[in-house]
C-alpha cells in the first residue's frame, strides 16, 4: 500500500470535519498529484505514519485548518516532490513545482521518531504567506524546514508565526557517515527571503544550527530567537 489515504490524481480536502489518519505500512496521506487543504477544514490529525505523514507530487498547498503530525511519524512530516515521467525526468507542467505553499492555518509537528527527518521538505520552493507553525525537531539530523530551492516568507494572506525548536544532534545513520549533518531549524539550498513574519528558531541541541542558507538571505521584518545564518550573503533590515 502506498498510503492509508491515496489518490492517483490530485487530492483536495474541504469541509468542517476532522480527519484522523493512521498509516501503519507506508505514508499516512499520499497523492501522485497536488494535495490541497481548504480553509474550511477543521483538523487533520496524523496519528501514525510508517513513512511520510503527508507526501505529494506536484505541490502541497495549505489554505487553512489545523494539521497535527505526531511523533510516531517515521520519515518526513510533509514532503512535496516533482512528478516524474517514465524516464524519471521532471514533467514540464505549470503545476509541477515541487513546492509547499502555506497561506494560513495551524501546523504542529513533532520529529522525534526517526533520524534525518524533516518537518516541511520540498524539492521546489517553500512559500509561506500566512499561518502558525510549531515544529519540534528533536531527532538527530532533523530539520524543521528544508528546501532544495528557495524559501519565501511573508504575511500577504494571514499573520505568519513560526516557532522551531532544533534540539537534536548529529545524524548517525550509516549512509550519512561521510556527511554527519547536524539538526537545523531551517535549511535552504537556494535563497531565503523574509518580508514580514515573526520567526523564532531555537538551536539548543548539541551543535544544532538555527538557519542555514546556501544562497542569499534577505530579511525585512521581525526575527526573534537564537540562531545563526551561515553559508550565505545576508542583507538584514529588521524593524522592532
Descriptions of predicted regions:
Residues 1-240:
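A composition-driven surface/loop motif
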Amino acid at each position: 500500500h502506498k498510503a492509508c489515504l491515496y489518490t492517483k490524481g490530485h487530492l483536495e480536502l474541504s469541509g468542517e470535519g476532522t480527519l484522523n489518519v493512521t498509516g501503519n505500512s507506508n505514508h499516512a496521506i499520499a497523492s501522485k498529484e497536488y494535495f490541497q487543504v481548504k480553509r474550511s477544514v477543521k483538523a487533520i490529525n496524523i496519528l501514525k505514519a510508517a513513512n511520510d505523514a503527508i507526501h505529494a507530487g506536484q505541490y502541497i498547498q495549505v489554505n487553512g485548518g489545523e494539521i497535527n503530525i505526531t511523533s510516531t511519524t517515521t520519515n518526513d512530516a510533509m514532503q512535496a516532490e516533482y512528478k516524474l515521467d517514465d524516464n524519471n525526468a521532471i514533467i514540464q507542467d505549470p503545476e509541477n513545482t515541487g513546492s509547499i505553499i502555506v497561506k494560513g492555518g495551524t501546523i504542529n509537528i513533532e520529529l522525534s521518531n526517526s533520524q534525518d527527518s524533516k518537518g516541511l521538505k520540498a524539492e521546489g520552493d517553500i512559500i509561506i504567506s500566512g499561518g502558525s507553525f510549531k515544529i519540534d525537531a528533536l531527532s538527530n539530523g532533523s530539520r524543521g524546514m528544508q528546501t532544495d530551492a528557495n524559501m519565501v516568507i511573508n504575511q500577504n494572506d494571514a499573520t505568519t508565526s513560526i516557532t522551531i525548536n532544533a534540539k537534536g544532534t548529529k545524524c548517525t545513520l550509516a549512509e550519512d557517515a561521510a556527511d554527519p549533518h547536524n539538526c537545523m531549524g531551517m535549511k535552504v539550498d537556494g535563497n531565503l527571503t523574509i518580508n514580514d513574519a515573526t520567526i523564532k528558531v531555537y538551536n539548543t541541541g548539541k551543535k544544532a544550527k538555527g538557519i542555514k542558507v546556501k544562497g542569499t538571505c534577505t530579511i525585512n521584518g521581525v526575527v526573534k530567537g537564537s540562531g545563526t545564518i551561515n553559508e550565505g550573503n545576508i542583507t538584514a533590515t529588521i524593524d522592532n
